[in-house]
């Protein structure tokens, strides 16, 4: 009898397939990186074909490592880098252009034109999002405007849009031969095209953005059987879809109003469960769908999205060559006692929450001859913690709820220096769970829930346990002095791009 749930976790830098048992433990997994394509400054692309090839490869690899076959898997869920935009031919499966990645800033002109009538918050009341290069709608518009024949093909229904979840679900369920063209509410809520109240595409916004409705996928719940897989997972129900940050909320079992988590990946993303209530933000956060299980009402969240955190460590490694592996940043940072008076604001693709400034670019401030590479490494880690503090402050303002602890996950949570500094600068305990692969786990939970492998959220919550807690050890005066320095540094990034 099938006794495991599988997740495909398609992230910004790599794709994983993870297989979990009923207790939420990882049984086996496989992972492969894919190429980051930078055609021009501010442009970031992926090859959709390479991503699909990597996906098939990691499914094979995970099954093989676990000595398993498709018959051992009850269901498969998909979680994905959100906003990243693919437009492809529904007859051949061929993309008309590379995937335009969430960090890509090429749509700034489109966003400015749209904001000329009604400002950056023109659509916020309906979609919960500001006009920003981050979201999919303007990326679709760019492809339709710039790829020859794309608009005509879209209007004729020959080419279709999807975020990565949609593209993978379509291929997993047969591609050109009957592939299912769907997206879940969490991914749809990141396009700028879905109305948060109706959970359907908004015709007025589609018309303003110039996007034909017929190219869009059907919006479905995050947990239900969408179709059956072909290929390596032949016969397995494809039954869960969640954007990566929403998947981490489910994996962290943040099912109650007021529960929050922060995921440290390429960027960092803090979400706060607001229940079935849509809470508009006055502090630069996003209002987003957290999850929708079957025919139960949708649950919403406030989100603070930070563009660059883990990516800054990669930059230190790949662009400066100061370290050879990302893990070495901790040892380098520990060569010094503090940041030597420097702050590093990584506005490589503008600033996301709570500023939403696409004109910002990265700065290192406070440099003196005293500063060495250890200070630089420490400033790199501290940047992640300071940006998280800004988001936490905004969340407390919007929700009126004071956070008592922060659940954390993602690759950087094994960096003790960073996690201790995070607790210090927030002034609240930081908690790492036993299973830190919460994004994949959330997708597996959504899929397993749809087929009855887990009968309810209480069963999932029972699986959650604490691995490590960091408590604040910094005095209030030091905390606020350091944070003031950060706020000052951030202002130096503004108005850089004309």
From Swiss-Prot:
What is one process in the GO biological process aspect for this record? Answer: glycerol-3-phosphate metabolic process
How activity is regulated? Inhibited by fructose 1,6-bisphosphate (FBP).
Any one Gene Ontology MF annotation carried by this entry is: glycerol kinase activity
Query: Where ADP is bound, by residue?
Result: 12, 16, 266, 310, 411, 415
Q: Which residues bind sn-glycerol 3-phosphate?
A: 12, 82-83, 134, 244
Keyword vocabulary terms for this entry: ATP-binding, Glycerol metabolism, Kinase, Nucleotide-binding, Transferase
Q: What is its EC number?
A: 2.7.1.30
Q: Name the pathway.
A: Polyol metabolism; glycerol degradation via glycerol kinase pathway; sn-glycerol 3-phosphate from glycerol: step 1/1
In terms of CDD domains, this protein maps to:
ASKHA_NBD_FGGY_GK (cd07769)
List, alphabetically, the SUPFAM superfamilies matched: Actin-like ATPase domain
Which of this chain's residues are annotated to bind glycerol?
82-83, 134, 244-245
Residues reported to bind ATP:
12-14, 266, 310, 314, 411
Q: What does this protein do?
A: Key enzyme in the regulation of glycerol uptake and metabolism. Catalyzes the phosphorylation of glycerol to yield sn-glycerol 3-phosphate.
NCBIfam families per the UniProt record, alphabetical: glycerol_kin (TIGR01311), PRK00047.1 (NF000756)
- Give the family from UniProt: Belongs to the FGGY kinase family.
Name the record gives this protein? Glycerol kinase
Q: Which organism is it from?
A: Chloroflexus aggregans (strain MD-66 / DSM 9485)
């Amino acid at each position: 009898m099938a006794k495991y749930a599988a997740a495909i976790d398609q992230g910004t830098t790599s794709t994983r397939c993870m297989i979990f048992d009923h207790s939420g433990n990882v049984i086996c997994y496989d992972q492969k990186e894919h190429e980051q394509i930078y055609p021009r400054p501010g442009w970031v692309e992926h090859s959709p074909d390479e991503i699909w090839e990597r996906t098939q490869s990691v499914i094979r690899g995970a099954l093989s490592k676990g000595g398993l076959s498709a018959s051992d898997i009850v269901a498969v869920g998909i979680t994905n880098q959100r906003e990243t935009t693919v437009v492809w031919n529904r007859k051949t499966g061929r993309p008309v252009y590379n995937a335009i990645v969430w960090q890509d800033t090429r749509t700034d002109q489109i966003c400015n034109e749209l904001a000329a009538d009604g400002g950056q918050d023109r659509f916020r009341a309906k979609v919960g999002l500001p006009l920003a290069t981050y979201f999919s709608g303007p990326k679709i518009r760019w492809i339709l405007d710039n790829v020859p024949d794309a608009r005509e093909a879209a209007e004729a229904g020959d080419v279709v849009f999807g975020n990565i979840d949609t593209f993978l679900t379509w291929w997993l369920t047969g591609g050109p031969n009957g592939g299912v063209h769907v997206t879940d509410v969490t991914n749809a809520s990141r396009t700028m095209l879905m109305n948060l109240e109706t959970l359907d595409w908004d015709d007025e916004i589609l018309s303003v953005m110039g996007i034909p409705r017929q190219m869009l996928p059907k919006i479905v719940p995050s947990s239900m059987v969408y179709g059956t897989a072909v290929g390596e997972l032949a016969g397995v129900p494809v039954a869960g879809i969640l954007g990566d940050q929403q998947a981490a909320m489910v994996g962290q079992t943040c099912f109650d109003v007021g529960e929050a988590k922060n995921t440290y990946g390429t960027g960092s993303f803090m979400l706060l469960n607001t229940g079935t209530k849509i809470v508009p933000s006055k502090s630069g956060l996003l209002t987003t769908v957290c999850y929708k299980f079957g025919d139960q009402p949708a649950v919403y969240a406030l989100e603070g999205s930070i563009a660059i955190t883990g990516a800054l460590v990669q930059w230190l490694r790949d662009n400066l060559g100061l370290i050879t592996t990302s893990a070495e940043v901790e040892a380098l940072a520990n060569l010094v006692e503090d940041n030597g008076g420097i702050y590093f604001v990584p506005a490589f693709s503008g600033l996301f929450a709570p500023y939403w400034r696409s004109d910002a670019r990265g700065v290192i401030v406070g440099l003196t001859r005293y500063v060495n590479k250890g200070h630089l490494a420490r400033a790199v880690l501290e940047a992640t913690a300071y940006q998280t503090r800004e988001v936490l402050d905004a969340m407390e303002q919007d929700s009126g709820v004071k956070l008592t602890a922060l659940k954390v996950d993602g690759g950087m949570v094994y960096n003790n220096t960073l996690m201790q500094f995070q607790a210090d600068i927030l002034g609240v305990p930081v908690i790492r769970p036993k299973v830190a692969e919460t994004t994949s786990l959330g997708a597996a939970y959504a899929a397993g829930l749809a087929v009855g492998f887990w009968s309810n959220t209480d069963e999932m919550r029972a699986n959650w346990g604490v691995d490590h807690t960091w408590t604040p050890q910094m005095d209030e005066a030091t905390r606020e002095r350091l944070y003031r320095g950060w706020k000052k540094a951030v202002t130096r990034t503004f108005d850089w791009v004309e």
